[in-house]
Amino acid sequence: MSPVADRSFTDFTQTRWSMLRQLQSARAPDVRDALTELAVRYWYPVYAYVRRCGHRSEIAQDITQAFLRQIADDLRSSHAQPPGKFREWLLAKLNAFLAGEWRDLAEGGQVPGAPPLPQLEARNRSEHVPGESPELAYRRSFALEVLTRGLKRLRAEAGDAGHLGMCEALEPFLTREPLPGQYDELSRKIGVRPLALVMALKRLRQRFRELVREELADTISSAEEMEAEQRALFAALDGKH
């Protein structure tokens, strides 16, 4: 799937770094929910990086919890807008954290929303690439998080519209072209004409790309950064630095 052409729907005054601004402005009753969402979104890319740095699974889980807890605390105590791309900012913060006295901080309590360790390790095994650097593992995991969130939203929209079955049938072709004969085979399987499948796939791809852009918009500071971040996303998925 190639990067998407520029669109004007993104309002960066409302979407840029929205997760971080939520943490900064959260009142006490809202802090738990804000921290939970931060943890759920970015937990695994951080965990994958720490694991590739050579830490055992239990230690990597403790480091990830302590790091995200510290990030949330730092953001709530400052109203300054962190500069640049969230992906790069988070990695720089993580490297600084690992270079510091993280062992004392890792003794803190559990972050709400923390994924269970068996789930993290199952994903680590399934996504492991021999010889992959910590940074590339982080970037690839971050890209997969963005795509996964976009896909979940696409499925939800299709379900609300009563088209979940069609969406699931065409999902394998959102990022690649069908092989010769696959349209006809799928047409017979679900009872829809091939031309209707072609049109449905075109609409699903367009909406999927829009949703991915919306997810990326939450992690960058300006519209000018969108195309560069999309290129970085697909480069990470291709295994390029």
PLM regions and their residue ranges:
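Intrinsic, short, N-terminal disordered tails of RNA polymerase sigma-factor systems
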Residues: 1-241
